Amino acid sequence: DRINDAVYDMIEANIRNYAGEKKHLLITGMAADAPMERVSGKLNADLSEFNLETGRDMISRAAVRRQLAECDGIVLVEEKGVSRYSLVQQELELAKDMGIEVLGVIVV
């Protein structure tokens, strides 16, 4: 994993700070399954006060869009060399259109 413990600590602190009263969060993005699972597993273990869901690729997967509609905020997980700027832009626009705050982006 390219993200070390110190970086995860910072990510967790930022999620807590930016989430405020938002407790139902979606971890999503265009990262491949393996890095998405690593990040979501670590965040689920360390952010137990949140209801975290994970769903990869809200652009083309209807099930993930349904998850998005139920959440208070999202954290994007993007992968160097995999995620494309145009798709990330679509993710940001979709969240904005639905009134769902993007709390941050994790690049793995």
Where are the predicted features?
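P-loop NTP-binding module
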Residues: D1-V108
